[in-house]
Amino acid sequence: MAQAGPTPQQAIARLRAEIEQHNIRYYVHDDPSVPDAEYDALMRDLQALEAEHPELVTPDSPTQRVGAAPLAEFGSVRHAVPMLSLGNAFDEEDVRAFDKRVADTLRGAGLLGLDQQVEYFCELKLDGLAISLRYEEGRLAQAATRGDGQTGEDVTANIRTIKGVPLRLHGAPRVLEVRGEVLMNRAEFERLNRTQAARGEKVFVNPRNAAAGSLRQLDPRITAQRPLRFFAYSWGEVHGLPEGMPTRFDEPAPGVRVASTLPRDTHGGMLDWLAELGLPVNLRHNHRERGADGLLAFYERIGKLRADLPYDIDGVVYKVDALPSQRVLGFVARAPRFALAHKFPAEEAVTQLLGIEVQVGRTGAITPVARLAPVFVGGVTVTNATLHNEDEIRRKDVRIGDTVIVRRAGDVIPEVVGPVLEKRPADAREFVMLTACPICGSAIERPEGEAIARCTGGLFCAAQRKQTLLHAAGRKALDIEGLGEKLIDQLVDADRVKSLADIYSLTAFELAALERMGKKSAENLVAAIDQARRPALGRLLFALGIRHVGETTARDVARHFGSMERIMDASEEALLAVPDVGGVVAGSIRRFFAEPHNREIVEQLTQQGVHPQAEAEPEGTSLAGKTFVLTGTMPNWTRDEATRRILAAGGKVSGSVSKKTAYLVTGEDAGSKLTKAQELGVPVLDEDGLKALLGL
């Protein structure tokens, strides 16, 4: 019998939890855990589900606020006017839809004629840290980070060290709250990293990371040494215009006049006013445009200038210029209706392939990695990029010494796209796969029919042991916060941790003695380990790192059997009774628990007080148990987005067409899967058909 998929409430809860974790990494720790595109897709999925089920919307949903709570080390500041984020556009269709919504609303309010186009103020989307500056009686009184949009961190002392931030404004209102971005120029970033490296100190990943880390120093003297810049781009609370400044009236509707607290009636005019007060405003590339065509032309123009700018941008921002129109359009909980951020795609660059090394994964997978001459791409300096596997290297004809195209896929994971053949040197060398593991010396074998070669050393191999532990501590497994790669490296290298069970015997005393671990950090890690003593059964099964057993399969197996003991003792036939578990997965689980060492680890976990909790059965949905296969390129949804929506509705997604396939979803260049589906009589849907099936 097919297992029921998650209810809308469960799907929403899962998405909220995942987004909140990403928010903490991005907003609090300045350490993004996923590409922007993946985060945006998660947020769109949650917004879609909440739109379908408004009764499930709660005030603490990520769609109702921005970011995450501030760190405890800084004082908290409550924003008088919330610091909202912006809605995102990723393609032309999104921009045109935004312009149409704005125009329709303004025409309905009598503020735009039928033959008129909306006028927008277009700006660069600076890639730094959002900051609010509060001036009282013309003096800088307080500075705060965005935080969660409602409450931020007090960074006044650090902001005062930035030379471009005025400590006093002349002719300012009694209260003026200025919003803007703190950033670091690329040239200054490179210079800072060279200095850091020469001192043996931490180097930063990119200018945004450097700016955020510099601003959030507890010691303002460190911030003062960093080359930070500030640009104002908006405002919050404004009260008490100076005497002598005439009162200005807005007309939010025909015949209605309202006194305004602002000295100008357009967004661009307000930025000019802020500049007149002495605040740094990035006016050089800002421009007014009309209608969607004007917005898209601005986007294209800035895209061509992007590489020549002295600082990083990750898109452009469109704002309705007229402030009365902005007030009519208003806000949703998370973003203004009158503004939109249009993001740039990933970047590509050309550099030299200096060499190819291999990395050993937790299952022994050998992954070739390109060592590159440093190149700035997608906002970071890239020196390594994935080559995936030996077959991929052959397919792309990449050779050591080649000039190669590097793409920062998803703006996070760099990959080698291919060689520039006309620049290939005469001494370019082909890659030859190693025959022995570079870490443990065990034989490297490539099973017949597989693309990936593997080290045969198992947990004897320190590299596999490290990756296994890192996997187990991860967010989708045991979620042990603070147990990261560098700490695991130290524990394995010292032979202190040989298996997952050893993690639970660690003490704060011995952890505090490790590099970069103080007493408080050690105590926090021990507390996180203690919290992981009662994981969901599926999480613990996933944490064991059984080959072919992913997060979803682990959860399905856990729900089917109910206890680790029953899973360990299950025959291959019993495992095959679990929906969507085939011979490969069943055999892999059976072989894993047939190994005495692995059973011993589970017993050791029990002795360390690890008691997994049974998985709850999900309630049924209309797509529960139905298997989908995706092929080709859909016009609007990415494959990942379509997959997430199917899973959220209770369906399953497979990589190959079979008699068990309920639907094949196709886009352009569908290929052989479409042919096979037609042969088997599998129903075929396009993107619109899938949306209809999902009730969208």
Curated annotation (Swiss-Prot):
Start and end residues of each BRCT domain: 618-696
InterPro entries the record matches: BRCT_dom, BRCT_dom_sf, DisA/LigA_HHH, DNA_ligase, DNA_ligase_AS, DNA_ligase_CS, DNAligase_adenylation, DNAligase_N
Names of the cofactor(s): Mg(2+); Mn(2+)
E.C. no: 6.5.1.2
Keywords tagged on the record: DNA damage, DNA repair, DNA replication, Ligase, Magnesium, Manganese, Metal-binding, NAD, Zinc
Keyword Ribonucleoprotein appears in the UniProt entry: no
Molecular functions per Gene Ontology: DNA binding; DNA ligase (NAD+) activity; metal ion binding
Record's catalysed reaction(s): NAD(+) + (deoxyribonucleotide)n-3'-hydroxyl + 5'-phospho-(deoxyribonucleotide)m = (deoxyribonucleotide)n+m + AMP + beta-nicotinamide D-nucleotide
Annotated active site: 125 (n6-amp-lysine intermediate)
Binding-site positions, NAD(+): 36-40, 85-86, 123, 146, 181, 319, 343
GO annotation (BP), single: DNA repair
Binding site for Zn(2+): 437, 440, 455, 461
Pfam families (UniProt xref): BRCT (PF00533), DNA_ligase_aden (PF01653), DNA_ligase_OB (PF03120), DNA_ligase_ZBD (PF03119), HHH_2 (PF12826), HHH_5 (PF14520), Nlig-Ia (PF22745)
A cellular-component GO term for this protein: cytosol
Assigned protein family: Belongs to the NAD-dependent DNA ligase family. LigA subfamily.
PANTHER family found in the cross-reference section: CHROMOSOME TRANSMISSION FIDELITY FACTOR 18, DNA LIGASE
Described purpose of this protein according to its UniProt entry: DNA ligase that catalyzes the formation of phosphodiester linkages between 5'-phosphoryl and 3'-hydroxyl groups in double-stranded DNA using NAD as a coenzyme and as the energy source for the reaction. It is essential for DNA replication and repair of damaged DNA.
Protein name as it appears in the record: DNA ligase
Annotated source species: Bordetella bronchiseptica (strain ATCC BAA-588 / NCTC 13252 / RB50)
Gene: ligA
